[in-house]
Amino acid sequence: MKFRGLIHFHSCYSYDSVLSIKKIINFALNNNLNFLCLTDHETIEGAQELKKYVEKYNLPIKIIIGAEYKTSLGDVIALNIKSNIKSMEFDEFVKEVKGQGGILLFPHPYKGHKEIEKIAQHVDRIEIFNSRVDKKNNKKAFKLAKKYNKNTYCASDAHTFLSLKNCILEFESEKTSFIKALSNAHITCLNCKNSFYFEIIYSQLIKSIKYRSFLLFFSQVKQFIKLCLTFRLFRRIS
């Protein structure tokens, strides 16, 4: 069977997004997606609500429960977990995820991480393309995956509806379970495109409002003005 869907994106259950569960479902149906791995920051609540919605309306979409957690070494994604991970100390985090039968993904390796090599050795897949990351660091992620002979994946890391289409993935699962295929199968990216600069500003402004951070808000306004003056606001990250 061929699976087509998204890995690593965010909804209104994240602190930097207002993307609704209903809009995610509509996107999936309109683009013939049959699996979704929603990975909100620090919580599986969004993924659980997504699954409830799919089950309520009996939709042909497989939902994998997961989240993106800020561990002691940086962001790591846990998929196929049953409850929120409690320990953020990296070694304990890994044990807890594996204890739940989960899968570990390494998102945007060269953005906000420490001990990158250590993380790479413990995860199941490494993200070699992130639409919110520049070309140079995506290339470094590809080399990292190759060095440790790790399976790979690509992600939109979408925080807005517009970004959802940046990275649709496809893989096949015939003689094994979906979860085993998600961990081991070769995943193809059908349309990897970078996000626009204004989308990053938008998500950070949402974060500043949800956290009531005036410092972050004004820093993003400043960045907005800078991008306008340099005519980059509506350009894709390069």
Segments predicted by a language model, with ranges:
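Mobile, glycine- and charge-enriched loop segments
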Residues: M1-Y15, K62, K95-G101
